[in-house]
């Protein structure tokens, strides 16, 4: 696979002019994984995404706020999930074997979602990452 740099303007016309890479067209099947602190509550109201748990709390979504208060306490901060996100049964080698057996040609892991929590020891995360949390490991690097 070769990558080439090209400048794009911050508008849809320019961004839409990007060609789809041939390898992506040929791959046909890949796996996308959303995994992070939002996996602790792993909950969202019907019709919403659990990955946007923090956004729901910040926006004042009454259903999400009620769920959060009932399950974690009204004053429990979202960042508190760093001490609860501890995937002790995470076996990245088994994941990789399963991906290969499935015929997937690529895997995309949300190594940092909208909440800013990193699944690797980023120097820019100010400690807000899996190595400094309960997991105590580089979840991205292990995969």
Describe the residue ranges of each PLM region.
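Mature catalytic domains of secreted/periplasmic carbohydrate-active enzymes
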Residues: 2-143
